[in-house]
Design a protein with these regions (language model features):
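Short hydrophobic segments within beta-strands
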Residues: 2-4, 122
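Catalytic nucleophile serine of serine hydrolases
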Residues: 7
Length: 142
């Protein structure tokens, strides 16, 4: 499974999924390609410019191999992935106009490199009513 995301993918994949797979003795290879706070627009910019700005953790049998300075294309070429997840930044996840054209272009690129992979969407969780995140007012605190 390859996750293309930000710190939320780090939380969900490295802190939750990897230990569950290890505990259940399910063989799984996880690639977590992340850039803190990364939006779909930023992922798209990194893709277009082929920017090696990501941290990439390769996890196999519970062993994490960290890599810095990875590009999205590098991760897509690394191996045949069964599942690939994409994710919007939490501060943009409720803003419909923040998805396109970036998401469609990212999907097209993923499909070009990994035509047999199942695409997944990692939905971030909402902020609490008393959240102090600077982007939270965009949602009228709801």
């Amino acid at each position: 499974m390859l996750c293309i995301g930000n710190s939320f993918s780090w939380d969900a994949v490295e802190q939750e999924l990897a230990p569950l797979c290890d505990a259940g003795k399910q063989p799984i290879i996880i690639g977590n390609l992340y850039y803190g706070g990364c939006s779909l627009e930023q992922h798209h910019t990194f893709l277009i410019k082929d920017t090696a700005a990501y941290s990439f953790r390769y996890i196999e049998h519970g062993v994490r191999t960290p890599n810095e300075g990875y590009s999205l294309r590098q991760a897509l070429r690394l191996m045949q992935w069964d599942y690939i997840s994409l994710q919007q930044a939490s501060h943009d996840s409720g803003i419909q106009s923040s998805y396109e054209p970036y998401l469609s272009d990212l999907i097209d690129t993923v499909r070009a490199y990994q035509p047999h992979a199942t695409l997944c969407w990692m939905q971030t969780w909402s902020y609490s009513q008393d959240a102090k995140h600077p982007e939270y007012p965009r949602y009228q605190k709801s």
